[in-house]
Amino acid sequence: MKINSILHASVVVADTEKSLAFYCGVLGLQQRTDRPDLGYPGAWLQVGEQQIHLLQVENVDPVTGRPAHGGRDRHTALAVSDFDELARRLDKAGIAYTLSRSGRRALFCRDPDGNALEFVA
């Protein structure tokens, strides 16, 4: 048996619409329209051949007390084609980020619910 790829990553959110404003409005991801009724709010977003699933469910995993730098927290890493454009979008939206401490062209930010994201050029 061989695992071929990652199909999706799930992210717990408190407010789907607020999260869509970040993931679609700021980051430019596209929302899929084929999400079935799963009995709770949420959204599926397309990221290349993979997806991010936003789950509006009770979050039993508090985000308080997590490291300020997302690289020291659990996070999802995404490849970007234009690092400077991403930084401009985050700046315009007032979203704080930190640069990678590894020397790579990468940055870390958090979504509206405190979930850490890494973007690598």
Sequence positions of predicted segments:
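N-terminal beta-strand motif that seeds the catalytic metal site of vicinal oxygen chelate
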Residues: 1-18, 74-78
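Vicinal oxygen chelate
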Residues: 2, 87-121
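Short glycine-enriched loop/turn motifs at secondary-structure junctions
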Residues: 3-5, 68-73, 100-101
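Core segments of cupin and vicinal oxygen chelate
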Residues: 10-51
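Short acidic/glycine-enriched loop/turn segments that link adjacent beta-strands
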Residues: 37-41, 72, 102-105
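A short, acidic/glycine-rich surface segment
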Residues: 39-40, 59-65
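Mid-chain, well-packed structural core segment of small domains
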Residues: 68-87
